[in-house]
Amino acid sequence: MLTIWVYYFFRDPDRTIIGDDNYLVSPADGEIIKVEEVDGPKEVGLENKKFKKISIFMNVFDCHVNRTPCSGTVEDILYKPGKFFNASLDKASEENERNYYKIKDKHGNDIIVVQIAGLVARRIVCETNKNQELNQGDRIGMIRFGSRADVYYENYEPLVKVGQTAISGETLLAKK
């Protein structure tokens, strides 16, 4: 039974990607738990810039493969060690183990994807490199066993609401 559950947890289904640079797609399966305007993350030097942020909580039953919300170039990847609070809590963004991907989209906008480890998830896997060119929906990594993904973006308007279910690579998060 454990073997079946592990196989289910680490599944990596193919997804139908829109492939339209005027939209951002969800980087993760899960529930939208926040849609807000915030300062950019200081970890990637954008704390003096305003962004919209969407947070997606992945429970242990969601697929944990993460994808890029847009086509573009990975300008930076930054790993921050940290604690392992429940990923749905606000303090998880600042205190939990996390990995930042700073992506320059095809329109020249900064898009930041943050993988945040949670109470059970204690391993972030990065499958991309700095300066790598990505297509919308490409796999960038995974977080094992329950976690969160935050997307910071500029110059797009949100299309999702808190409580909505998101599917990685398919759900349209925001529109140009």
Q: Which residues does each predicted region cover?
A:
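Contiguous, well-folded functional domains in the mature portion of proteins
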Residues: 1-176
